[in-house]
């Protein structure tokens, strides 16, 4: 395969290896050599593509955000009503790709290290804003703007909390149960509220 075609493949392999390595260790205290070994490439090649561990970690976070955004956009395009849009947003956050054990562990590790890294904190804020705005867009068609913001805030907190619960392992809700819990929360919050469509 020509070198120009190999670079995106190698970059993706290293990012996938970073997710696995961070997830397995539950820490960003990993080395480029460990990630490269997991990817089956040399540390020199990893440094060549990313220029160091910090840039590789940030590239991994950006990749996770892009994947989530891509999956979310595809799901939302299939939604025809506000309720379908809300269901799509929730389902994507608990899809097999997003709710995988190593991916969850990587996300939680990023949250911990956001306290020391402005770059990681900025990317996590981007994620939170996107989730919130997507939920509000659908919810404000069903209730007031203020109420939509409050429900979206609660739903976002539930999603984050369910990721933490799942990372704990035993007795944690599976994806289907997690989806049902968030959907039930939103339905209860909307019940009895005057619809914006009326």
UniProtKB/Swiss-Prot annotation:
GO terms for MF: DNA-binding transcription factor activity; transcription cis-regulatory region binding
Source domain of life: Bacteria
Domain HTH tetR-type: residue ranges: 8-68
Record bears the keyword Protease: no
Pfam families named in the record: TetR_C_6, TetR_N
Keywords in alphabetical order: DNA-binding, Repressor, Transcription, Transcription regulation
InterPro entries associated with the record: BetI_C, DNA-bd_HTH_TetR-type_CS, Homeodomain-like_sf, HTH-type_TetR-like_transc_reg, HTH_TetR, Tet_transcr_reg_TetR-rel_C_sf, Tscrpt_rep_BetI
GO terms for biological process, alphabetical: glycine betaine biosynthetic process from choline; negative regulation of DNA-templated transcription
DNA-binding interval(s): 31-50
Record bears the keyword tRNA-binding: no
SUPFAM superfamilies membership: Homeodomain-like, Tetracyclin repressor-like, C-terminal domain
Pathway annotation from the record: Amine and polyamine biosynthesis; betaine biosynthesis via choline pathway [regulation]
Xref: NCBIfam families: betaine_BetI (TIGR03384), PRK00767.1 (NF001978)
Biological role stated in the UniProt entry: Repressor involved in the biosynthesis of the osmoprotectant glycine betaine. It represses transcription of the choline transporter BetT and the genes of BetAB involved in the synthesis of glycine betaine.
PANTHER family in alphabetical order: HTH-TYPE TRANSCRIPTIONAL REGULATOR BETI, HTH-TYPE TRANSCRIPTIONAL REGULATOR RUTR
Protein name, entry field: HTH-type transcriptional regulator BetI
Gene name in the database record: betI
């Amino acid at each position: 395969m020509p070198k120009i075609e190999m670079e995106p493949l190698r970059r993706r392999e290293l990012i996938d290896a970073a997710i696995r390595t961070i997830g397995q260790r539950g820490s960003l205290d990993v080395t480029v050599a460990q990630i490269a070994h997991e990817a089956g490439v040399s540390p020199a090649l990893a440094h060549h593509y990313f220029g160091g561990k910090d840039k590789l970690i940030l590239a991994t976070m950006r990749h996770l955000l892009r994947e989530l955004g891509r999956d979310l956009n595809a799901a939302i395009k299939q939604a025809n009503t506000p309720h379908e849009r809300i269901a799509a947003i929730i389902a994507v956050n608990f899809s097999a790709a997003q709710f995988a054990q190593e991916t969850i562990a990587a996300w939680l590790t990023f949250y911990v290290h956001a306290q020391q890294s402005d770059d990681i904190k900025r990317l996590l804020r981007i994620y939170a804003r996107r989730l919130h705005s997507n939920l509000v867009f659908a919810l404000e068609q069903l209730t007031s703007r203020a109420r939509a913001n409050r429900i979206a805030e609660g739903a976002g907190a539930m999603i984050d909390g369910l990721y933490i619960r799942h990372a704990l392992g035993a007795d944690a809700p599976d994806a289907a149960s997690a989806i049902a819990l968030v959907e039930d929360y939103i339905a209860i919050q909307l019940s009895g509220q005057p619809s914006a469509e009326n």
